[in-house]
Amino acid sequence: MAFVLFNLAAVAALIGIDQLIKLWAVQVLQPVGAMPFIPHVVELRFVLNPGMAFSLLSGRQLFLIIATSAALLAVAYGLFFRSRGKRLQQAALVLVLGGGIGNLIDRVLNGEVVDYINLLFMRFAVFNFADICVCVGVALWVLVIFLDEVHADDTASKEQ
């Protein structure tokens, strides 16, 4: 039970942080449009994204909501039923779930996602905290899978 409560609390914390930052962006950043954060490196720029990453699938809100919900249910299943005792995998899935739900809340309530981080040193999409959580979580998840494969190969070669 502690396993479930801890992971639920972690997911809720990520969602809360995401929603608080987005609330700040709407109230403070939207009226001014943009402001420097780290000069010549990062600016805070208010953008409403009607699609997913890079505005892909803009105008397909129902599809995005259904597809995202299905993916998040699969991630939640993996977190709560398949990752006991695997802390790195749990961390990865908590990040993906928290970030995914944060953006899903925006999409369901507003039809678009609030983005606000703009990298000035490279041409890239404006993104948000939830996007960072999802990307770091997926990268960590890939690392976990890779490490599991390496461990399985080592175990198999030692048994031969």
Say what each PLM segment does.
Residues 1-160:
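Alpha-helical transmembrane bundles and membrane-interface segments of multipass inner-membrane proteins
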